[in-house]
């Protein structure tokens, strides 16, 4: 039996109703497309920046490691023994001409870490011993024997420790101490204070000791140098040391420069025949130039001491350089009494000791010889195992240091 298939006349009504996922109103407009594209672009840029940041961080780490290695290399170069040289001329930012201690000049490379502003003519520099490259700039006073005396290094000599010399004490205090402590007094009067003081006289009369007392009593910086220290082996070193002394004094003003035995470099000029004599004369000319270049507003005073004032160059002695000249003669009777009193103040003298006997003797003796007499008397008492100094001890000391018996020289006849 055949069955006939009956078709549904309305199949569309039997199908489930379907709706599109987005309606026409849900389709993004052109403005939203632009914002979406911009968001994607910014996201890509952010990812690129993050990649760049990681790259920069890695590069920074590498550069820091290289910087540390370069610093260690520079320290290694500067830590090895360096050759001391003198900067002469800058060619460009990377090269210069320097002079070595052997007298030769070199065209060298400058280390990139060196501060170019410190490279001035005559500056002391450190050179690599293999390549002679300029690897360090030394302080101005690094290779100089000139230095300031600190408060603990200053002599403990006071004015009371110097017997006699009352006039000399007053004059040096007026010329050196007073202008540094009460400069306004000279302004009110309308005069310029002395620039320099010359102490001259026989040996042992207290010139150096008085300068020590000035260093003790003043708060100014004190620079002490002996004239023979300026005479160096190589040409130009002496004048450079003179410049260093005055530069150091100006940097630490108020300051006092004491040059002992100045006759070693300040003798009268003559027609020099040797290089050494010409170098000494160049030192003198540099000294004259530095003293002429003094500004009165800079509180720097110069004290010079010598035993031979008659041999000094007249240009140094003229007013304007050494304005005050203080003579230290051999002590007279009153001065000898004061020196004996100072020297024996701490000594254990016997009641029989009469110092006036030694003061009244006509022998011309210096203050240093009086000190030696007292020292010898004390040594003689120690030799005899005594705690009291007797007159015979002083007599022994006097004969030892002053009176020489003629029989001592019969051997040479």
Curated annotation (Swiss-Prot):
The keyword ATP-binding belongs to this UniProt entry's keyword annotation: yes
Residues binding ATP: 201-208
Region (Disordered): 1-30
Keyword annotations: ATP-binding, Coiled coil, Cytoplasm, Nucleotide-binding, Nucleus, Proteasome
One of the record's GO molecular function terms: ATP hydrolysis activity
Compartments reported by the entry: Cytoplasm; Nucleus
Keyword Nucleotide-binding on entry: yes
Pfam families linked: AAA, AAA_lid_3, Prot_ATP_ID_OB_C
CDD domains registered for this protein in UniProt: RecA-like_PAN_like (cd19502)
SMART domains documented for this protein: AAA
Coiled-coil residue spans: 32-80
Cysteine disulfide partners in this protein: none
UniProt GO cellular component terms: cytoplasm; nucleus; proteasome regulatory particle, base subcomplex
Function, as annotated: The 26S proteasome is involved in the ATP-dependent degradation of ubiquitinated proteins. The regulatory (or ATPase) complex confers ATP dependency and substrate specificity to the 26S complex.
UniProt similarity note: Belongs to the AAA ATPase family.
Protein name (database record): 26S proteasome regulatory subunit 6B homolog
